[in-house]
Amino acid sequence: MQPSHINLYQRPATKNLFRYRNKVNGSKIMNILSVGECMAEFSPDARNGKFNLGFAGDTFNTAWYIANNHSDVNSAYFSKVGDDELSSQMLKFMSDNRVDTRYIKEIPDSTIGLYLITLANGERTFSYWRNNSAATFLGQNSIDVEIAMEKQDMVYFSGITLAILDSHSRKTLFSCLRMARDAGKKIAFDPNLRPKLWKDKKEMCDVIMAGANLSDIILPSFEDEATWFFDADPISTLKRYQNAGADTVVVKNAGKPISFFSQQGIGTVPIDPVGKLIDSTAAGDSFNSEVLVGLLRKISLTEAINNGAQLAKKVIMGQGALVKSNV
């Protein structure tokens, strides 16, 4: 699959498609768009040693938890897929789980990325095949991105979303996020630092902060921020992202208290002890889903954080990235 094979992208004159949204939105349904890559997952079955096919990916996991736990929220996903059977299976899986797929575009002669999970002494390791996957071209056409964002109340993306894109697609996404924010959409961002996806540390940190500059809500993980931005403590992380322009920052910190910044000030929320840890794969993604929905509903930030922590606690006591659980 090479970009030269794709002839889908004609670029009509760009206009701001977002500006009329607030004047016509009489619906009680809230709309959240998650942007990124969903991949095919092959995970081992401990009972027979065979591999099971599933679908997951950081921003998709969040979209899935929103769709499965909140009937009053339309959880849409924006990405690109191929025209093969595996892509079709993934789209069906999304639709079957109430994720709105109307904005996902198909690229001929392409396929989706995939990853393989292997287990050794209870530890999970991941092998990825995602270079030139269809999702890496999600920012090629600005009109596709604008249309996807037009009817949303909130747009959510991550550092992994940014990492898989080339510089042109990244600039397109940034431009569309800026227009959406100017039109009153809330922009939410999980930095989700994954150095293996980047050319080098400097590129990763520079692009992450560029994404933060466009965001209202930022949901970092302290362990990553301490490693790559050398933050001494969660308050340092809060202040750095506050200075980038966010009005809400929530710092996840494994099982330790969660720190937050909002217009009401800085605070912490203690976390209940976790029972038996089975699989922490989507702890942060599930947590994010409850915080984002809570902020859209305008409940208190501490209540939203508590809801997120309770869901994440259930998720890590289940198996896999997507765990059915009523919140």
Label each PLM-derived region with a short phrase:
Residues M1-I29:
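N-terminal amphipathic/basic-hydrophobic helices that include classical n-h-c signal peptides
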Residues N74-I160:
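Conserved N-terminal subdomain of the carbohydrate kinase-like
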Residues C38, I160, P191, S286:
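Active-site metal-binding loops of divalent metal-dependent hydrolases
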Residues Y20-N97:
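Glycine-rich phosphate/adenosyl-contacting loop at the front of the ribokinase-like
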Residues N25-L33, M179, A232-V327:
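Conserved phosphate-binding/catalytic region of the ribokinase-like
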Residues A183, P195-I266:
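Conserved phosphate/ATP/ADP-binding segment of small-molecule kinases
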Residues L162-R170, W198-K199, F229-F230:
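Glycine/threonine-rich flexible loop motifs
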